[in-house]
Amino acid sequence: MANPDTIFSAPIDKIGDFTFDERVAEVFPDMIQRSIPGYSNIISAIGMLAERYAKPHSSVYDLGCSLGAATLSMRRHINQEGCQIIGVDNSSAMVERCRLLINAYRSDTPVTIVEADIRDVNIQDASVVVLNFTLQFLVPADRRALLEKIYSGLRPGGILILSEKYIFEDGVVNELLIDLHHDFKRANGYSELEISQKRSAIENVMLPDPIDVHKQRFQEIGFKSSEVWFQCFNFGSMFAIK
């Protein structure tokens, strides 16, 4: 059973920026399930998409792999000779725990977990690349360069799966979806104090884009097709195919 997320349950005098440290890594499975609507559906479908798009003797990347939920889902579904999965995260606490979880299960598909900045990773001969709630934590100026690097490293016909929180240019829509998301968190046991303090901690480090910005960027980079395949409130997932 996952350790309960109580990080923001008591009043904090000075709230610093949210970081993926040891405290977060310890409660991350509980935090993510109670904070992101549809997370389990996204993880399951990432495995299904990987099964469809992973090719023999290619690489599959999970960039910002955290504790490896997407990596494990893909490994369960991939059955291609010579296909390897590479998970990357810059949090030593996440990487340490992720390796333990990965090594707890045997599989014919090899997995390597690397501690590194995803902006520095060389993407090569990829059939599938996953950015599962990761791009939104990069400074906006670095996002296009990473996506261009991914595009260059993807095989023709390869797929990028990008899950993100979205903002909406229509203020009424944006506020409604934010309110619904907060209702979702309340229904999952978070208090008003926890919701408020978490929002204060994360608002300067997670800067979401509108869906149209994602689509336009995909098109400009050269992806031939892209679409939202899942959305719940202001969270969702897209694919882009080279």
From Swiss-Prot:
A Pfam family hit: Methyltransf_25
Catalytic reactions of this protein: prephenate + S-adenosyl-L-methionine = carboxy-S-adenosyl-L-methionine + 3-phenylpyruvate + H2O
Record-listed S-adenosyl-L-methionine binding positions: 39, 64-66, 89-90, 117-118, 132, 199
GO molecular function: carboxyl- or carbamoyltransferase activity; S-adenosyl-L-methionine binding
EC number: 2.1.3.-
Zinc as UniProt keyword: no
Family (UniProt): Belongs to the class I-like SAM-binding methyltransferase superfamily. Cx-SAM synthase family.
Function: Catalyzes the conversion of S-adenosyl-L-methionine (SAM) to carboxy-S-adenosyl-L-methionine (Cx-SAM).
The protein's name in its UniProt record: Carboxy-S-adenosyl-L-methionine synthase
